[in-house]
């Protein structure tokens, strides 16, 4: 490149000021002109200016890699293998590694080392969890008992009595155990368990456990970013809520698989299909509806157009299966779960249950002396978070919007236990993909927070998990926004570079 001009230190300082956002309109115009001249190769800095630019680089980072390449007469950030090669035409080139010129510089191998170091401890805790929960499940004292009983009732034509506590308890005592576990999900889900009700309870428990393991593996295979197979597998194997859901015979892994498939479709711009698929997860409406609410605020109309008719079909089918009057009964049961001491037999939320929940509602219910005050504070906090997440997530791409909506949904969920946190694998895997980019510390922290907080919450006071979940939401929002801003600025640079070289962007 022929040196056609000199860019002095004062002008580079002006360039630096422009990146801090403190220039007036006239100066911003001059700054933009300088950047374009640098990209075009019409001006090059003198030695003093080059030193000033190097000082600037520590702040600018990856955002001006193309400018840096032109200043140093080097290849762009997309081709960094020749950074230490001699300058064409003679003369040695500066070989100081630019933090933004090499994507590997943004990688943090120590993060994988941290995960590997924590793995024995986490897997040891997982093993203990399985040793405790599997015998409980085999004795009929796990939540799988309610699914098995509900499936049996649908199979023998008693679906109209699914929410009759006395009838359900009688069947459960005959088939499983005398530990009451009332069915609290929509009727359509009970139909899924009708086939395995032909088997004995213990055999059905083992079969569903294996099915859940298969669903979990399939879910991770769906969403794992390229080249990160083993970290995704490690997170799956060491994330306590996943094991808790499988060992307890819960349907949270089914929801995880549905949500992962919906996330994949949504990321590929198939929003209608994603919305329709997510509607099948309405058996966990307390998680699905907050996601849908954010999609409404983000004006994802195609997603809503797919969700609405499928959700209506789910409700109509449930009404046909169990009777539409049973949907009203189901609604009253759900409202009964909303009180610390509900009025309906078998469906009240006991104090011990509220202490085992993990959402904001559980946190305020347990730390505030008045139940009504806790509900008001929960509502206000949830609305405030909804507004904040909606505004912060508006600029994100589809993939990160959906993942952020999932992180938000578990925090404001109406009724949520530790095993329901399995769906957090979606934002955790999304954060895992960002650990290979520059400025990825927030993404790394976002992965570690639920990974480490979940086992502590299980062993101590689960309702306090709302605090690290809140931190998780803030940190992962920061990680997603930082990535979005970097991608946006790099895209502007690439288009400017392509335009200057006469290549369509």
Where are these regions (language model features)?
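Cysteine endopeptidase catalytic domains of the caspase/legumain-like
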Residues: 1-82, 87-88
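Membrane-interface alpha helices of multi-pass inner-membrane proteins
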Residues: 272-285, 289-296, 405-412, 448-455
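Primarily membrane-embedded glycan-assembly and transfer machineries that use lipid-linked glycans
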Residues: 94-273, 295-425, 432-433, 487-491, ...
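Hydrophobic alpha-helical transmembrane segments of integral membrane proteins
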Residues: 116-117, 191, 237-238, 281, ...
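Short, low-complexity, intrinsically disordered N-terminal modules
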Residues: 1, 73-76, 91, 341, ...
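Non-catalytic N-terminal targeting/anchoring module and adjacent flexible stem/linker
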Residues: 73, 86, 90-92, 100, ...
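Membrane-embedded alpha-helical segments of transport systems
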Residues: 283-286, 313-317, 442-445
């Amino acid at each position: 490149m022929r040196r056609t001009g000199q860019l002095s230190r004062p002008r580079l300082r002006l360039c630096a000021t422009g990146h801090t956002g403190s220039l007036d309109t006239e100066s911003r115009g001059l700054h933009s002109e300088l950047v374009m001249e640098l990209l075009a190769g019409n001006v090059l800095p003198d030695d003093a200016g080059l030193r000033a630019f190097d000082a600037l680089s520590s702040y600018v980072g990856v955002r001006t890699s193309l400018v840096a390449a032109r200043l140093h007469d080097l290849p762009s950030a997309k081709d960094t293998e020749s950074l230490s090669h001699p300058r064409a035409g003679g003369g040695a080139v500066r070989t100081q590694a630019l933090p933004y010129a090499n994507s590997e510089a943004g990688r943090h191998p120590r993060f994988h080392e941290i995960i590997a170091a924590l793995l024995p401890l986490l897997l040891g805790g997982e093993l203990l969890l399985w040793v405790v929960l599997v015998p409980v499940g085999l004795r009929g004292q796990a939540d799988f008992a309610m699914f098995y009983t509900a499936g049996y009732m649908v199979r023998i034509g008693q679906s109209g009595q699914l929410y009759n506590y006395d009838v359900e308890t009688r069947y459960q005592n005959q088939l499983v155990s005398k530990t009451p576990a009332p069915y609290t999900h929509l009727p359509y889900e009970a139909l899924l368990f009708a086939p395995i009700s032909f088997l004995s309870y213990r055999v059905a428990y083992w079969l569903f456990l294996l099915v859940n393991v298969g669903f979990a593996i399939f879910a991770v295979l769906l969403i794992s970013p390229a080249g990160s197979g083993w970290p995704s597998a490690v997170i799956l194997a060491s994330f306590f809520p996943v094991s808790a859901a499988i060992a307890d015979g819960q349907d949270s892994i089914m929801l995880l698989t549905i949500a992962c498939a919906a996330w994949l479709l949504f990321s590929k711009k198939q929003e209608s299909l994603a919305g329709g698929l997510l509607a099948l997860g309405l058996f966990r409406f307390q998680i699905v509806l907050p996601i849908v609410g954010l999609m409404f605020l983000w004006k994802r109309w195609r997603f809503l157009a797919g969700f609405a008719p499928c959700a209506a079909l789910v409700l109509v089918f449930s009404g046909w299966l169990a009777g539409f009057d049973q949907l009203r009964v189901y609604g009253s049961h759900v409202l009964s779960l909303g009180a610390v001491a509900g009025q309906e037999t078998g469906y009240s939320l006991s104090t011990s249950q509220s202490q085992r929940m993990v959402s904001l509602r559980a946190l305020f219910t347990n730390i505030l002396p008045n139940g009504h005050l806790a509900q008001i504070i929960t509502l206000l906090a949830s609305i405030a978070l909804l507004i904040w997440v909606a505004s912060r997530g508006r600029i994100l791409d589809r993939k990160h919007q959906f993942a952020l909506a999932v992180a938000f949904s578990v925090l404001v969920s109406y009724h949520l236990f530790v095993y329901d946190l399995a769906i957090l694998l979606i934002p955790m895997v999304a954060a895992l993909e960002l650990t290979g980019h520059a400025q990825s510390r927030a993404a790394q922290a976002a992965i570690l927070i639920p990974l480490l907080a979940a086992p502590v919450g299980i062993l101590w006071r689960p309702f306090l998990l709302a605090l690290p979940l809140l931190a998780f939401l803030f940190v992962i929002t920061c990680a997603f926004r930082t990535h979005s801003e970097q991608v946006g600025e790099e895209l502007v640079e690439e288009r400017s570079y392509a335009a200057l070289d006469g290549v369509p962007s």
